[in-house]
Each structure stands twice: as structure tokens, then as C-alpha cells.
Curated annotation (Swiss-Prot):
InterPro entries (alphabetical): Ribosomal_bL9 (IPR000244), Ribosomal_bL9/RNase_H1_N (IPR009027), Ribosomal_bL9_bac/chp (IPR020594), Ribosomal_bL9_C (IPR020069), Ribosomal_bL9_C_sf (IPR036791), Ribosomal_bL9_N (IPR020070), Ribosomal_bL9_N_sf (IPR036935)
Function: Binds to the 23S rRNA.
Molecular function per GO: rRNA binding; structural constituent of ribosome
Signal peptide, first to last residue: none
Annotated family: Belongs to the bacterial ribosomal protein bL9 family.
Gene source species: Burkholderia mallei (strain ATCC 23344)
Family annotation (SUPFAM superfamilies): L9 N-domain-like, Ribosomal protein L9 C-domain
A single GO cellular-component term on record: ribonucleoprotein complex
Keywords: Ribonucleoprotein, Ribosomal protein, RNA-binding, rRNA-binding
Gene encoding the protein: rplI
PROSITE patterns documented for this protein: RIBOSOMAL_L9
Swiss-Prot/TrEMBL GO biological process terms: translation
Top-level taxon in the UniProt lineage: Bacteria
Protein name, UniProt field: Large ribosomal subunit protein bL9
Amino acid sequence: MQIILLEKVANLGNLGDIVKVKDGYARNFLIPNRKARRATKDAIAEFEVRRAELEKVAAEKLAAAQAVGEKLNGQTFEITQKSGVDGRLFGSVTNGDVAELLKKAGYEIEKAQVRMPEGPLKMIGEHGVQVALHTDVVVDVTVNVIGDHA
């Protein structure tokens, strides 16, 4: 299906690009989340009329993400979990737990924005975690997992 992107989409294209994607990806994700529209002649003409407005909105989102990124980058957050004597956790710290921790600290972060390269944290200690605030703004934070010996 040919679509026109209404915002930058990672691994796909930038605002205004006309790309071909699988029908299911367009119908189930891109179009419902208002990231794209079908690339009909009418839609392309309407997009060209609204292009400046959409670019302004995209620039505002990027500026807001960069402002939050400057505050968040390099910070350390602590979370306490039950652990054994050997330092392994009973359970794990997931991206949902990290997102909840950041929300309590006053940041508007969703679970999907937290990237954990090594997967869920299963040991006590400091671990690096990435937070994708925007497709162009990814910051690194440190999560210090403190063991609560059972």
C-alpha cells in the first residue's frame, strides 16, 4: 500500500515521504496512530496544503523532546527489588518498571519508550538503560537496582 507519512517514522521515512508498506502495517498501526495516510491524489494535495503546519508541529515535538532529554540524560534512578544473597533478583526489572520509576520522578515516559539492550534487569547493581523521547532523541539513564534481601 502506498502511504504518505505525516511524521517521521523510524526505519521508514520522514514527514512527507511517500512509501510502500505492507497493508497490515498501514491499516493496523500507521493510519490509526495518525502517522500516515493513504497516498491518493486528494490526500497528497491536502498534505501539501498542510505541510507547513505539520512541519511546525514536528519541530515543536522535537524541541520539547530535546528539552526533556537534556534534563534526563545521565541521571541515575534507584529501584528496590527483592533479591537473594548472591545478588540475583527474585523476578526482574522490566521496561514497565523503569517507565513507572521515571513517571514518579516527574517525566512523561511510556513503557514502549524504554529500551533495555540486555533485556530485563536480573542482577543488583547499576545498569544502563536508553529512553527514546523522539525518533531523533535517545538519552541514556542509569538504573541502580538495590537488593532487598529476603
